């Protein structure tokens, strides 16, 4: 009997086991609570870190897209003029569109100051005149060879431009092969290069095209030539702009809103130089003026020179009126590019 009682657990043993079980349960519950608290705090920390990372990436993206390009000296040649005064008259609609000419069975708008008629020879002469007129109209500041050169046009026209530059402005040594102008992509490269360049460094942007008249064409054939020296500073500034690709399905109004944010503007500029493009009605509904500064009647079809031409007109407008001016044109790598030129006092 005594042996059987010894084998049975005492009441003290049962109490100890119960206490141990309760203590173990409390430890496990506390550990679980601590793990849950730690997980929660880590989740909150990770969420905050992710938000900070996203905000940093957005800041970096905007900093890159807001890098300014200063337009220092420039020239625009076309059927309606070759001086800033001419283009201000065009922008203010104080000058009637040029008379169309019959050319090879088609219609054309031609610059009256060029006497050569054959297209290739005319384009070569236009490239040469671009240099000579720039030298005649430009300031007296000392020039240095540009960091980079961008050219919109044929190689033959570039060689004529380069040869004339050597004769007329000897200190402007130009490369035998320039970088091809690629619209917004080139503006992005220029902005990045100038951000890391010395204050006196410049980038040359130029182009020239004579479009051959075609029978039955919707628009008369036109011609245009542009030259700009870009640097870190200048009377007017622009950013790289934004691109719209119809195939991606993005709304043009969303792209336009991004351009305003890029330039830190609360609303569209009063003026926007452009050529007609399909689908611009959506911009009109969001406050952009797509009619008053349309350039089709003044230039005709100028091919790949549309972008540089409207950019030049926007720069002339911004410098004279001291107000932002938009520009919109076809882009070599996208459907459209849209941007804004601002006077120096409104620099980002």
Predicted features and spans:
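Conserved "HGTGT" condensation-loop signature of ketosynthase/thiolase-family condensing enzymes
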Residues: 3-189, 195, 200-202, 209-348
């Amino acid at each position: 009997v005594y042996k059987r009682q010894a084998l049975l657990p005492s009441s003290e043993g049962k109490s100890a086991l119960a206490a141990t079980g309760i203590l173990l349960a409390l430890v496990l519950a506390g550990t679980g609570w601590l793990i849950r608290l730690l997980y929660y705090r880590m989740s909150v920390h990770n969420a905050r870190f992710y938000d900070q990372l996203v905000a940093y990436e957005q800041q970096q993206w905007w900093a890159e897209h807001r890098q300014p390009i200063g337009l220092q000296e420039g020239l625009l040649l076309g059927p309606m003029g070759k001086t800033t005064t001419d283009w201000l008259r065009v922008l203010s609609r104080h000058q009637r569109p040029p008379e169309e000419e019959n050319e090879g069975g088609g219609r054309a708008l031609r610059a009256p100051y060029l006497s050569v008629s054959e297209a290739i020879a005319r384009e070569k002469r236009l490239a040469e005149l671009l240099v000579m007129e720039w030298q005649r109209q430009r300031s007296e500041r000392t020039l240095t060879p540009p960091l980079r050169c961008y050219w919109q046009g044929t190689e033959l026209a570039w060689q004529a431009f380069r040869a004339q530059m050597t004769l007329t402005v000897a200190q402007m040594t130009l490369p035998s092969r320039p970088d091809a102008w690629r619209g917004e992509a080139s503006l992005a490269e220029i902005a990045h290069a100038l951000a890391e360049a010395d204050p006196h460094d410049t980038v040359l942007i130029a182009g020239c095209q004579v479009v051959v008249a075609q029978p039955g064409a919707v628009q008369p054939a036109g011609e245009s030539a542009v030259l700009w020296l870009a640097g870190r500073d200048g009377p007017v500034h622009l950013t790289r702009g934004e691109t719209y690709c119809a195939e991606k399905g993005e709304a043009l109004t969303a792209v336009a809103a991004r351009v305003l944010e890029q330039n830190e503007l609360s609303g569209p500029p009063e003026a926007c130089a452009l050529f007609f493009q399909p689908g611009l009605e959506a911009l009109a509904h969001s406050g952009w003026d797509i009619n008053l500064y349309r350039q089709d009647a003044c230039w005709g079809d100028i091919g790949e020179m549309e972008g540089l031409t409207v950019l030049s007109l926007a720069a002339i407008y911004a410098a004279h009126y001291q107000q932002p001016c938009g520009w919109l044109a076809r882009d070599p790598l996208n459907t459209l590019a849209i941007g804004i030129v601002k006077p120096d006092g409104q620099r980002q």
